[in-house]
Amino acid sequence: MDGIVTEVAVGVKRGSDELLSGSVLSSPNSNMSGMVVTANGNDSKKFKGEDKMDGAPSRVLHIRKLPGEVTETEVIALGLPFGKVTNILMLKGKNQAFLELATEEAAITMVNYYSAVTPHLRNQPIYIQYSNHKELKTDNTLNQRAQVVLQAVTAVQTANTPLSGTTVSESAVTPAQSPVLRIIIDNMYYPVTLDVLHQIFSKFGAVLKIITFTKNNQFQALLQYGDPVNAQQAKLALDGQNIYNACCTLRIDFSKLVNLNVKYNNDKSRDYTRPDLPSGDGQPALDPAIAAAFAKETSLLAVPGALSPLAIPNAAAAAAAAAAGRVGMPGVSAGGNTVLLVSNLNEEMVTPQSLFTLFGVYGDVQRVKILYNKKDSALIQMADGNQSQLAMNHLNGQKMYGKIIRVTLSKHQTVQLPREGLDDQGLTKDFGNSPLHRFKKPGSKNFQNIFPPSATLHLSNIPPSVAEEDLRTLFANTGGTVKAFKFFQDHKMALLQMATVEEAIQALIDLHNYNLGENHHLRVSFSKSTI
């Protein structure tokens, strides 16, 4: 459950007398149709209901001790796991609310659960019990905002079909919009951090929670606002924009979720209403100095030649990369270096050339050294810190020659070449002037096609004389199974799917730059597509 931590404290069930104190009440046994509740001292909200025996089950629940800034969406989310929420009345001046569920059974389940597990909103325990009313009737003209939120959440829960609007006023909110956005980053050459997303999306309202993850070989995020209106504004303004100059394109849709469950505050997920959450996987928060420098650099203003208002100058992009991985880029005073330590290699199979080819998918490898006294480990020097971070992010934990490799940043600043005349058995190789570097040309399309290892490979530079069967046979000879193949229309490019990611890695190592004849050397990279 979102925002819930297990504690012993349990709210004492009682009626809504305290909630309604100071309001106009009818006698205990009379119809309460004329009751007026003052919600915040300024505006009045009419509430109609029927009196019930204190503590008896009801589908209308009374919630108290709410934080002052809590939103309707957060309160509604408390009830969603148990059934459909049919009405809500917020009494913000009293930090309390009524929540109506579709059935009494759902309300009983909810109360029973929260009697054992104290719910928290914004790091504050809240208390839930049955109200004295079996139905919640509100004047929608005086409760308009809550009704807008409730309609949006209900539509998402039942239809799960995101709609895009054309205006951003509250009255124009379409029913199937959630306060949670699903964000996909295309052409992600620079790392996009959780803090980058928070800075960008905070311009449209208070961001409550963010979760980042990789799915379908793409970096994605779920981001929750306190209000669906803010989510709509952000989607309309940011969908299709670039975070950095000519890359990192935002693809935004409304999520099917209406509330996010964040368990840890770290570099992958954050609940801004729960600063007490543990880091979980041990990842520390961003260094204050880096965070401050990043905030200063990234003004999110347009720059000449940029494709969108979100484009950020190169220095800011470098700062983002530094913030993401604490690595350095030329001209940026950030810690870290360009050298990676790769361990748990298959020492019988690995060579400097195979490491150059694999790590070269994510940057221009300068030098490779397999350690003389520990041949299952190697040092790899990339062209810059951003490339080393990308390679580490994408290759750590992948299988190469049957072993799961580990990739970390090294303490070394450079990879030393062996002294002249010293035979190191070919364990060290300098690739500084290699013609196979993918990223040496500024603005190369390779910058826009960096994806995690996948079973599907993208093939290019195929000569006209090479047929599908030729390529299938070629890739099958690497020891794997070709599951699918598809030529592009011009037959110069194709997609080829191996049985596993490990087989695809092996095929890429073996066949990238393979001579197909007619002065055509095959280009192989990982694809985000499937066949």
Swiss-Prot record:
Keywords: Acetylation, mRNA processing, mRNA splicing, Nucleus, Phosphoprotein, Repeat, RNA-binding. Residues 59-133, 181-257, 338-412, 455-529 form the RRM domain. The modification Phosphoserine is found at S26, S27, S308. It is found in: Nucleus. One of its GO terms (molecular function) is mRNA binding. One of its GO terms (cellular component) is growth cone. SUPFAM superfamilies: RNA-binding domain, RBD. RNA-binding protein which binds to intronic polypyrimidine tracts and mediates negative regulation of exons splicing. May antagonize in a tissue-specific manner the ability of NOVA1 to activate exon selection. In addition to its function in pre-mRNA splicing, also plays a role in the regulation of translation. Monomer. Identified in a mRNP complex, at least composed of DHX9, DDX3X, ELAVL1, HNRNPU, IGF2BP1, ILF3, PABPC1, PCBP2, PTBP2, STAU1, STAU2, SYNCRIP and YBX1. Part of a ternary complex containing KHSRP and HNRPH1. Interacts with NOVA1; the interaction is direct. Interacts with NOVA2; the interaction is direct. This is Polypyrimidine tract-binding protein 2. It comes from Mus musculus (Mouse). The gene is Ptbp2.
